[in-house]
Amino acid sequence: MSVLLVCSCNMDITPKNIVSDDDMMGSPKGMSIYMATLYSHMPFEDFKYMAAWGFNFNGWLGTLGIDGSGEAMNRDDVFRTFRGEDNPCWSNAFELIHDANHLIESLPSYRSNFTESEYDFFMGQGYFVRAYVFYQMARRFGGVPLVTHTIAYPNSSDKLEIPRASEEDTWDWICKDFDTAISFLPATSLMSGLPNKYAALAFKAEAMLYAGSVAKYNETVTGRLTGFGDKTGVRVIGFSPDTYRDAYIRYFSEAYK
């Protein structure tokens, strides 16, 4: 004869392996962790980047001594076209953009937990990250889907399938995000290693010089690159013959503002 004993258990407890917005955005300490997460996945072309293999965030390139600096430039067919199979820069970029969008949308609800300077600093980081990631994508793909808000899953296809914007609209948005970041960021960074106002200005200048060069010189050479979205008909690669002159003048002007 067996006896089954059943004890009453309270299973309605908060999982300890899930970090909530209250944990991350409720204090400067939590936001420092959020910043570490963002910047550890930023597509900076430094020691974790090679043209042939893209971005590697696991330290693998560094351990091999072929991290894209100096002698590495002559190794392993480094100049071949990077196709992205090993390191999907497209999907990785949108994961980072999602995190930046979440910061921009959610941090205002926790504003009372920060001083004015702290709040502005972290908001500026969100806009800077989004601007920089879009910039790196535009360099590689031209016009990209401008996902500027968090997308709830699951959802209908019209909410999830955001088409690529034109290349000109993409660069315009990058400029706008950099300007917003610059307006928030202080002259002196509140955290070591994170950009201040002048670092954001420098990256904006770099992005706008790149955009202006593409707008001007791609449109004036034989065999220029251009392309249109299959569904939208939007010029996702290159600039319109009617607008490229105004575009490159605008971008070059933005570079030194």
Predicted region positions:
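A solvent-exposed, charged loop/short amphipathic helix patch at secondary-structure junctions
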Residues: T220-A247
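Acidic/histidine-rich, surface-exposed loop or edge segments in extracytoplasmic proteins
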Residues: K16-V19, R75-D86, I237, P241
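Short, conserved phosphate-binding/catalytic loop or strand-edge motifs used
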Residues: H149-N155
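Short coil/turn linking the two alpha-helices of tandem helical-hairpin repeats
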Residues: A138-R139, P145, S189, Y210-E219
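Polar, glycine-rich mid-to-C-terminal structural blocks
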Residues: R250-K257
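Conserved, well-structured interaction surfaces
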Residues: S27-P28, S32-K48, D67-F141, S157-L194
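TPR/Sel1-like alpha-solenoid repeat signature
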Residues: Y127, L201-A207
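Bacterial Sec-dependent N-terminal signal peptides
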Residues: L5-K29, I174, A205, T220
